[in-house]
Amino acid sequence: MIDQLSLERLSAESAPSQSLSIRYLSGGLAFCVRMLSPAREIVACGFLPFSLSSEKKVEEKFLELFYTYDFLAYPYHQIYCYYSPESAVLVPTELVTAGQEGLWLFEGLDDVKPRPVGDLSVCYLSTPLPEETKSFVTRADSTLVQLFRRTLLVVELIPACFPALSLRLEHSRGFLASELLVLLEGNQLTLLAHRRGEVFSYRQVSLRVPSDEKSLGEEVLFYLFAQWQHLGLDGAIDRVALGVPAPDFAMEVVREGQAYAHLKELLAPYVQTVEVFTYSPC
């Protein structure tokens, strides 16, 4: 979905006072242009679909969008690229050493898929959390990361869960209870637990991707409750937040929304507070 009127407001002259956020998805790029003011007003946002040609590589489809939409190459003050990590762990920021992030993602972890020694198709990144005492150390697709860095001059790479997480951290600062944040995208489930603005648990799971929303909701419930019990959370006090990307970005959110509706019904007897919220994915 593209709002042509909002795109007409974009120009190379105004770009230095704006930021561009993009999120790579299987079908294209979600984007958002914001002002640099404290309110970060949205100037334009939407979804740019890739070419339907199955023969083209991801790099070719990505560059084709840049040739088609001039505004992607404007000289923005800052550019943020959101990516989905293959795996990630929480690490105290003071213990993260540049160039040695991969040591934290050893193959003994349940959620880390083994890779051949010396595999150059992946890279390791670290990003401080908003509360700054911990960092996400991630393993990502090197092809995509290098593509971002070659194409965009001033780029900051950020894990895809950060927009929703930042929103919930700010929201939860006034609560004493813990909150388990649930993010579902395709076959990837992300579970983040936080309390009073501080993240204390993270888990990423690859789902079987059931054919119907009911089965999908039940599979999410299985992993959600396993994490809930592992963390010792209390259904009468602690909360669950189910994140749904805003429809403006034209991502396939209907299936996830229906799965969440079923999940919320299943959780009702056990968790007193379950909230479904929308967020901008970039």
Regions found by a protein language model. Name each.
Residues 1-39:
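N-terminal basic/disordered segments at the start of proteins
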Residues 16-18, 77, 178:
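Residue-level marker for the onset of beta-strands and adjacent loop->beta junctions
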Residues 21, 71-87, 235-252:
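Short glycine-rich phosphate-binding loop at a beta-alpha junction
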Residues 23-29, 123-236:
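Small-residue (GG/TT-enriched) beta-loop-alpha framework at ligand/catalytic clefts
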Residues 29, 49-53, 87-90, 246-251:
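Short acidic, S/G/P-rich loop/turn micro-motifs used as interaction or catalytic elements
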Residues 44-57, 203-205, 213:
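A cross-kingdom feature marking solvent-exposed beta-strand/loop segments within repeated
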Residues 45-51, 60-170:
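Active-site neighborhood for divalent-cation/phosphate handling
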Residues 200-281:
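Accessory, usually C-terminal, subdomains that scaffold auxiliary metal cofactors
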